[in-house]
């Protein structure tokens, strides 16, 4: 099925590309998410007339993502308190939701889906590097300091 992409899609293309995808992928994911429209003659003409407007919208979203990434990087360190044992092992773990809530409380709005923990949840006290994927092209880093709760 031929579709026109309205946004950058990983491993597929960027705004304005006409790509051939499986019908189910287009029908169940790309079209409902607003990332693509079927490549009919009417849609191709409509897209070409609105191309500049859509490119400006994508540029605005990207600029907002860069601004949020700068705010996250500017925070430097966020401290979380959690119950732990004598050797610094936590009772439980610190996951994406806990980190997202702490960063949001520090003043930068972050969704838990934007937090990247490549090594899984955090289970020890100390400082940990955490990545944030604010946009498909924009990443930020933050240090999370986990301290033992008194």
UniProtKB/Swiss-Prot annotation:
Query: One GO CC term of this entry?
Result: ribonucleoprotein complex
Signal peptide per UniProt: none
Q: Which PROSITE patterns match?
A: RIBOSOMAL_L9 (PS00651)
Sorted keywords for this record are: Ribonucleoprotein, Ribosomal protein, RNA-binding, rRNA-binding
Pfam families associated with the record: Ribosomal_L9_C, Ribosomal_L9_N
Please give the superkingdom of this protein's source: Bacteria
List the InterPro entries hit by this protein, alphabetically.
Ribosomal_bL9 (IPR000244), Ribosomal_bL9/RNase_H1_N (IPR009027), Ribosomal_bL9_bac/chp (IPR020594), Ribosomal_bL9_C (IPR020069), Ribosomal_bL9_C_sf (IPR036791), Ribosomal_bL9_N (IPR020070), Ribosomal_bL9_N_sf (IPR036935)
| The keyword Ribonucleoprotein belongs to this UniProt entry's keyword annotation | yes
Q: According to its UniProt record, which protein family does this protein belong to?
A: Belongs to the bacterial ribosomal protein bL9 family.
Q: What does this protein do?
A: Binds to the 23S rRNA.
* Family matches, as HAMAP family: Ribosomal_bL9 (MF_00503)
Official protein name in the record = Large ribosomal subunit protein bL9
Which species expresses this protein natively? Erwinia tasmaniensis (strain DSM 17950 / CFBP 7177 / CIP 109463 / NCPPB 4357 / Et1/99)
């Amino acid at each position: 099925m031929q579709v026109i992409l309205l946004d950058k899609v990983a491993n597929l293309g960027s705004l304005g590309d006409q790509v051939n995808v499986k019908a189910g992928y287009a029908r169940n994911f790309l079209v409902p998410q607003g990332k693509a429209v079927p490549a009919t003659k009417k849609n191709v003409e409509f897209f070409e007339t609105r191309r500049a407007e859509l490119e400006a919208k994508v540029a605005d979203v990207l600029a907002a993502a860069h601004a949020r990434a700068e705010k996250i990087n500017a925070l430097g360190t966020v401290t979380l308190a959690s119950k732990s044992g004598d050797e610094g092992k936590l009772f439980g773990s610190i996951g994406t939701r806990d980190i997202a809530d702490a960063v949001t409380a520090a003043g930068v709005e972050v969704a838990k889906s934007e937090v990247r923990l490549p090594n899984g949840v955090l289970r020890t006290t100390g400082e940990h590097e955490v990545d944030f994927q604010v946009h498909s092209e924009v990443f930020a880093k933050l240090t999370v300091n986990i301290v033992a709760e008194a």
